[in-house]
Amino acid sequence: MKKILLTSLILLSFNTVGEIAPEIKALKDTPKSVLFIGNSYLYYNDSLHNHFKNMANERFAKFDGSKNVKSATIGGSRLKHHDVERLIQPRAISSIEKFDLVILQGGSGEVLSESDRIEFGETAHQHIETIRSKDIEPALYMTHAYTESHKDYAPNLIRSIEEMYTLSGNTNQVLVIPVGLAFEAAYKERPDMKLHKLDGTHPDLLGTYLAACTVFASVFGESPVGINYDYNGSVSAEDKLFLQKIAQLTVNNYYGLSGSD
């Protein structure tokens, strides 16, 4: 009965959606440990969690990302493929007893049909309940859209992605990290920038850097602008500043916050 009610709510939400805004605009507490769960969107380019932890290590003197930021990924996976309950058990990953924050990243195809979106909504709810049962805060990672070289490209796909993640975030009262909207904003400003691989789906290095900046701004509630980390010189000073500003602007716009960056 509970599943039927949840499915009905998801269907009603998608059928009546107009412009929606996220209801949760910040985490309850600043995390000291973070687990990313997802697929190749996370592990490409030396893994997003490594870039995120290097940014956090630089900005926060007492943050120990090497010890407390981890990633569990399966190539090509959707949310349903992850055994979240096992991953968040004490010492299931390294020596960490309990993560403060678990970030869930869904598969890119989970937005392509109504049945896919319903399954995403149901699975996200199940995982979020599992995470909360361990007194861990959950969050959702909004994925980016495909580019034209991908067979499933559609000009307005990002709107469907935005709606699906925002609705799920509001339904479950969790923070949504607007990575997909940051990609959209960056391409609007600099259409020539290479955020995707040639396959039109996976992130290139600059896309991963932008995603890490967006996660940083969302999770910590602080601007990434001014962070020196550039992946050992692999991100130019111009691109670094541009992506940092885009990430913060996207977060401000999505959460309805004020800010000059």
Predicted regions and their residues:
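Positively charged n-region of N-terminal signal peptides that target proteins for export
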Residues: M1-I4
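N-terminal signal peptide c-region/cleavage motif recognized by signal peptidases
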Residues: S13-N15
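Conserved SGNH/GDSL esterase-like catalytic core that processes O-acyl groups on lipids
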Residues: S33-L35, L42-G121
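Short hydrophobic segments within beta-strands
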Residues: I37-G38, Y141
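Extracytoplasmic/secreted envelope proteins and their assembly/folding machinery
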Residues: H49, K53, G121-I128, E162, ...
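Alpha-helical cap/lid subdomain in secreted, periplasmic
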Residues: R91-L205, A217, G226
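Conserved catalytic region of serine esterases and O-acyltransferases that act on ester linkages
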Residues: L195, H202, A212-D261
